[in-house]
Regions:
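Sec/Tat signal peptide C-region and signal peptidase I cleavage site
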Residues: 19-27
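Predominantly extracellular/secreted and cell-surface proteins with exposed
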Residues: 38-114
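Bacterial N-terminal signal peptides
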Residues: 7-19
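Positively charged n-region of N-terminal signal peptides that target proteins for export
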Residues: 1-4
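Acidic, low-complexity intrinsically disordered segments
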Residues: 117-120
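C-terminal partner/receptor-binding element of secreted or periplasmic proteins
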Residues: 122-163
Length: 163
């Protein structure tokens, strides 16, 4: 129960800070923001807020499952190409029944892939995927373990790229 409360508190804190993220970002800076829930694989919800600023990358992620599994971390790399973004992050906290299966341990890395298909109801749904944990930093950019191929059932992601 305390872990679930922690997850909800973290998600709320990130949600409160997300609008401030647009203050950090100015035109010409890559960013990925949003929250989405998959309607499969246990219905996880992934919140991502990563903004490349002149001072460096800011942001993080929270992934939470209804069964209490969660992972929280800080963004280490943001890669944007068109309407698709990949965020590599280092996990700072995790727990729950899927922690071992997903290899989500503090200090390990995860890659989250998102495809922004426009505002909900205007095109197909945004797409999402995330990797299992990596013991070493997998690097920056597209990762086959996180290719965004699964549609979200609720939520919205926004991808902004420099070019």
């Amino acid at each position: 129960m305390r872990k679930l409360l922690f997850i909800l508190t973290m998600a709320l804190a990130i949600g409160v800070l997300a609008p401030a993220g647009s203050v950090w970002a100015s035109p010409g800076q890559d960013q990925l923001t949003g929250t989405g829930t998959l309607g499969q694989f246990g219905d996880p919800t992934a919140h991502v807020n990563a903004i490349q600023t002149a001072a460096g990358l800011r942001g993080g992620f929270t992934i939470a499952y209804p069964d209490g599994t969660f992972a929280v971390g800080s963004a280490t790399c943001l890669f944007v190409s068109g309407n698709t973004a990949y965020v590599t992050s280092q996990i700072t906290d995790s727990g729950g029944p899927r922690q071992q299966t997903n290899s989500w341990f503090a200090g390990s890395y995860i890659v989250i892939g998102v495809q922004d298909n426009g505002e909900p109801g205007t095109a197909g749904p945004d797409m999402l995927n995330f990797s299992p944990g990596f013991a070493a930093d997998p690097g920056c950019g597209p990762n086959v373990s996180a290719t965004p191929v699964f549609p979200i059932t609720t939520g919205n992601y926004r991808v902004f790229g420099v070019g």
